[in-house]
A protein has these predicted regions:
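C-terminal luminal/periplasmic domains and tails of membrane-associated envelope-modifying transferases
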Residues: 1-151
Length: 151
């Protein structure tokens, strides 16, 4: 909560797990029919790990999903768009690195590609065609650039 405090990799992973856990709890509460509690849990998860401490990434997807399912569509879409920007920037960097020099980037490339795939599926499920349609093209573009021998 203190400005300027650096979060090392161990702390970042722990806080990523918090985001994911709060999001999954919110989705479980929604499935049980408790929208009010789901929304409370979602905001708690967003508040514990604000974007200025850690960018929204794969581990915030369930929080965005919960917001949309709770009727906070615009807020959820805003988080999705920020996640897409973060993942897109990272993938853009990776495709700029020659394939022979991408050693050590496999995990984060895979995580960010999975982020795109999961957002695409979630967007289709929720009827968010304004996100899904351009994302499908972007996903295919990155796939062809990162995995050219798989085509």
């Amino acid at each position: 909560e203190k400005p300027g405090v650096y979060l090392d990799e161990n702390n970042r992973r722990m806080f990523s797990n918090y985001r994911s856990t709060f999001g999954e709890l919110a989705l479980s509460l929604l499935a049980a029919g408790d929208t009010a509690k789901a929304l409370e849990v979602t905001y708690k998860g967003l508040g514990l790990v604000p974007e200025d401490k850690m960018p929204y990434d794969y581990f915030a997807l369930s929080l965005a999903d919960a917001l949309i399912e709770c009727g906070r569509k615009d807020e959820g879409k805003e988080i999705i768009n920020r996640i897409l920007k973060y993942s897109g920037d990272y993938l853009g960097y990776c495709v700029a690195v020659p394939a022979t020099e991408r050693f050590g980037l496999e995990y984060t490339i895979g995580l960010n590609m999975q982020t795109y795939i999961d957002i695409y599926r979630m967007s289709r499920r929720l009827g968010l065609d304004d996100i899904a349609t351009p994302l499908e093209q972007e996903l295919n573009r990155f796939y062809s650039l990162l995995y050219p021998s798989n085509r």
